[in-house]
């Protein structure tokens, strides 16, 4: 859902940022007239020398122009110096790309309206999965890696036969540095040190990166190593409701989700008004404290014994750890039926008829809960790959690739405790002054533990493993200088497994159930940066986790396995392809491109617990995937593109589990679906690109995707024997394999369509006089519409698809100084359709993020930098229903980093 974009604060931030850029650039212009010192390494294009940020822009345009398909790229500005601190934040600058943020940093991307599960990511040519926390999908988590470890990113939006299958949206290539990439022989090195300050947490944390590379005099052998370490300590402040729900006026008071009574409801109309209006399930202010540390290492050995042969060994390791504490206080009984809202009495109320919500209420007999949780997540990623390239003759050459990677996600510690104060009177909330930040008062002194009882403890641990291995080879033969035949294949294995354990009993009894919890609690406060209305309780007692851990001897407690936490998928992907590349002249125009076909066979073995039985189901499917890409150059500065391809994306890993529940007496089954086929689509792309000057581009692209199958959840009556489950599961029961069962599961639905437009404009202002000629602009806009069938007659847009998105950057660069201000806008998008608890949908409202950076070259080797992220302290605003009821309204503050960078 899009909210109005004409915010005074947004315009103010944009104006101040642009003014600051001009102000900062003025001294640099003054020094521009002085004799210039030796310039850093440069990229030369048509006798014009550009460096730094402008050099990286020109490199990206060179790649975009020469590719046969639709490709956008980002390059490092210098050794171990990427344009953004976060990979996802960098990729979002490209047309068609939007990102999802968590705790103030980008984590996953969507390309042309298709989310992370539809996008493949390769690191040094090897498909990779980076898992963190609760991520159990195919989506890649970019927060795992420091951007300094990489020197380029390419986003391939059209498919060719030589690129492995598996993406409906895009294939993203991340490339780390290699020693023979540097111009000079001998040593090359870089070291950067930063301190980053968050204005919400008021903490300063370090960020350090270094690179050392060596090559021999003949540039035939080299070794490179890089390291990056960083910390973050953000705070998340928010208000959330955990959705809204409504009662039913056709039922009696105290039935269903109805309140027990309504004192001011003296008429049937008033009663109906209250019982049919939505109310927040768990209204609460909350904040989380996070401590993150990230460490990454890369190593590359590169050998070129001759011009015809190259061997590269790439090694990579990354670690990402997060500790989070999340204290909050809430009216928990609004989310319960029996023993909760059915006992609550409405003492006073007001209705917002536009949203159909109880916008203000005073309630008696409300259960108040104070809780606190601690989680430690640990993630590790390992990869090794060996790439071989050899030219057998001037016309015949080949490549081979072998490699493996593993991603481990662990939650070794996760525990939480609850203080409950039941049947409290006078609980009040009021949204009338602000529909995102209500006044909340609990009706008693919530800083005192006298009314609270320690009632529950929850402890769990779990994790997931993703393993991937690849062997691939390709041969190329130049039939003529204008025509090349390519053929090759891959054999890939993919493994995924999860596990989970939890405490057997969570409700405390006996001496552990403490009444009066002052000795076991601590006072926390929300400091008012949320502009919370007057009258709200901003300080409250919460469980002190470490005191209670000691009191309950929690680390001595045994854990039991959770059956639904154990599942596995073993996948084997085999592919072969043949492709013809052409580059010729036709009617005075350069015509180039490729045409090919790929055959892919997928075999899966899925395992999981159905009740307490461990079930194994095998599946196999095959796809024939033709593709065609054409680039026509009517002039040297103009490229017209056309692309068409059949594509596929494999089902989400969680959807393949045969685990779930089985009730033979009622003939009901609820599980994933290990027999799922992939998402399949036919893509069409048309684009025009005008490279009107050095570093200049004006481009437009339209795209259309006919999604032939889309995975949805349905409940249907089908024969047991059609499910692929073993008949032995029915042994000893009255049910037989020939009977029908009511089955809730994932199925391949009928699909839908997606279409859109991208516009891209980039230009240095070299046509302006003097000082102004050092400025430049980069901007892109993306429009996407989609409609897919979610089953049961429900049609709507794809989740994670924003209708409108744009990115802009205004930059200034001279020999020793550069600065830029960037904005990234994303319109609202869906998270779930339909939503839960009777809400029509769940989604995120539009956002706009502003960033700025500047740097000054003190010398040829030493650079001072200043970066500011999220200048407007943008809120992440989640909603439910088309009426835009608040679900989670969160912010994490601004970050400012100052640093020094040295290179040799």
PLM features per residue range, with description:
Residues 250-280, 342-366, 427-455, 508-565, ...:
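Flexible glycine-rich, low-complexity coil/linker segments exposed to the extracellular/periplasmic environment
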Residues 157, 176, 195-199, 229-233, ...:
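Transmembrane beta-strands of outer-membrane beta-barrel pores
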Residues 708-709, 825-834, 855-904:
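C-terminal beta-signal and adjacent terminal beta-strands/loops
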Residues 132-139, 148-155, 162-265, 289-295, ...:
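Outer-membrane beta-barrel translocator/receptor signature
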Residues 176, 193-195, 204-215, 281-326, ...:
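Outer-membrane beta-barrel transmembrane strands
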Residues 704-706, 723-833, 872:
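Gram-negative outer-membrane beta-barrel transporters
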Residues 49-82, 108, 116, 126, ...:
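N-terminal periplasmic "start-of-domain" segments of outer-membrane beta-barrel proteins
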Residues 88-130, 157:
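Extracytoplasmic beta-strand/coil segments of soluble accessory domains associated
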């Amino acid at each position: 859902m899009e909210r109005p974009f004409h915010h005074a604060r947004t315009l103010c931030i944009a104006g101040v940022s642009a003014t600051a850029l001009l102000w900062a650039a003025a001294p640099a212009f003054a020094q521009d007239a002085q004799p210039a010192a030796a310039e850093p390494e440069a990229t030369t294009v048509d006798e014009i020398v550009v460096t730094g940020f402008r050099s990286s822009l020109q490199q990206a345009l060179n790649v975009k122009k020469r590719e046969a398909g639709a490709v956008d790229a980002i390059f490092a500005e210098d050794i171990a110096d990427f344009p953004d601190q976060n990979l996802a934040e960098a990729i979002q600058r490209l047309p068609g790309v939007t990102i999802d943020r968590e705790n103030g940093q980008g984590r996953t991307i969507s390309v042309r309206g298709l989310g992370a599960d539809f996008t493949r990511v390769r690191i040094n040519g090897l498909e990779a999965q980076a898992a963190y926390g609760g991520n159990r999908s195919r989506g890649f988590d970019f927060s795992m890696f420091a951007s300094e470890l990489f020197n380029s990113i390419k986003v391939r939006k059209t498919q060719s036969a030589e690129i492995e299958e598996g993406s409906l949206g895009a294939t993203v290539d991340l490339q780390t540095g290699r020693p023979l990439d540097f111009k000079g022989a001998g040593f090359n090195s870089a070291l950067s040190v930063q301190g980053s300050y968050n204005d919400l947490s008021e903490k300063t944390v370090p960020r350090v990166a270094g690179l050392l590379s060596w090559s021999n005099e003949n540039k035939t052998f080299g070794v490179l190593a890089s390291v990056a370490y960083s910390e973050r300590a953000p705070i998340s402040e928010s208000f959330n409701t955990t959705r809204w729900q409504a009662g039913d006026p056709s039922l009696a008071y105290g039935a269903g989700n109805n309140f027990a009574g309504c004192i001011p409801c003296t008429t049937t109309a008033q009663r109906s008004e209250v019982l049919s209006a939505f109310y927040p399930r768990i209204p609460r202010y909350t904040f989380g404290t996070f401590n993150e540390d990230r460490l990454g290492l890369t190593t590359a050995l590169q050998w070129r014994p001759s011009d015809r042969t190259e061997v590269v060994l790439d090694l990579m390791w990354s670690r990402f750890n997060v500790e989070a504490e999340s204290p909050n206080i809430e009216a928990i009984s609004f989310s319960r039926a029996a023993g909760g809202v059915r006992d609550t009495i409405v003492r006073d109320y007001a209705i917002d008829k536009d949203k159909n919500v109880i916008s203000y209420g005073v309630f008696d007999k409300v259960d108040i809960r104070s809780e606190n949780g601690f989680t430690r997540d640990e993630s590790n990623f390992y990869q090794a790959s060996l790439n071989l390239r050899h030219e057998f003759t001037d016309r015949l050459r080949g490549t081979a690739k072998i490699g493996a990677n593993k991603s481990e996600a662990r939650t070794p510690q996760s525990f939480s405790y609850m203080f409950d104060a039941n049947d409290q009177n006078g609980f009040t909330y009021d949204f009338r002054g602000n529909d995102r930040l209500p006044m909340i008062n609990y009706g008693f002194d919530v800083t005192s533990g006298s009314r609270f009882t320690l009632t529950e403890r929850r402890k769990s641990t779990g994790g997931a493993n993703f393993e991937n291995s690849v062997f691939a080879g390709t041969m190329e033969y130049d039939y003529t200088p204008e025509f090349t035949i390519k053929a090759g294949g891959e054999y890939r294995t993919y493994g995924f497994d999860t596990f989970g354990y939890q405490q057997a009993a969570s409700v405390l009894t006996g001496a552990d159930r403490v009444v009066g919890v002052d000795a076991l609690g601590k006072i926390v406060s929300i400091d008012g940066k949320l502009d919370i209305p007057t009258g709200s309780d901003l300080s409250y007692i919460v469980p002190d986790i470490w005191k209670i851990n000691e009191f309950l001897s929690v680390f001595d407690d045994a854990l039991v396995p959770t059956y639904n936490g154990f599942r596995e998928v073993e996948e084997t992907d085999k592919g072969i392809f043949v492709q013809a590349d052409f580059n010729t002249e036709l009617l005075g125009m350069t015509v180039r491109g490729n045409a090919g076909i790929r055959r892919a066979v997928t075999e899966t073995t899925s395992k999981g617990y159905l009740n307490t039985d461990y079930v194994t189901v095998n599946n196999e499917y095959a796809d024939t995937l033709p593709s065609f890409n054409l680039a026509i150059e009517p002039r040297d500065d103009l490229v017209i593109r056309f692309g068409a391809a059949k594509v596929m994306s494999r089902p989400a890993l969680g959807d393949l589990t045969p685990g779930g529940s089985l009730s033979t007496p009622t003939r009901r089954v609820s599980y994933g679906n290990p027999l799922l086929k992939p998402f399949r689509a036919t893509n069409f792309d048309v684009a025009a690109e005008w490279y009107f000057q050095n570093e200049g581009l004006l481009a437009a692209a339209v795209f259309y995707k006919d999604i032939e199958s889309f995975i949805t959840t349905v409940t249907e009556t089908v024969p047991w024997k059609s499910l692929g489950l073993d008949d032995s599961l029915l042994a000893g029961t009255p049910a037989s394999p020939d009977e029908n069962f009511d089955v809730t599961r994932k199925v391949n639905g009928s699909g839908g369509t997606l279409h859109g437009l991208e516009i891209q404009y980039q230009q240095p202002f070299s046509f302006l006089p003097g000082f102004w000629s050092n400025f430049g602009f980069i901007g892109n806009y993306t429009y996407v519409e989609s409609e897919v069938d979610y089953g049961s007659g429900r049609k709507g847009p794809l989740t994670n698809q924003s209708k409108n998105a744009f990115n802009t950057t205004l930059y200034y660069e001279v020999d020793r100084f550069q600065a830029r201000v960037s904005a990234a806008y994303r319109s609202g998008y869906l998270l779930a359709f339909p939503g839960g608890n009777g809400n029509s949908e769940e989604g995120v409202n539009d956002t706009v993020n502003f960033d700025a950076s500047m740097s000054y070259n003190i010398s040829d080797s030493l650079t001072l930098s200043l970066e500011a992220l999220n200048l407007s302290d943008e809120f992440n605003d989640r909603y439910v229903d088309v009426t835009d009821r608040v679900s989670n309204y969160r912010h994490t503050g601004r970050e400012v980093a100052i640093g020094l960078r040295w290179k040799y």
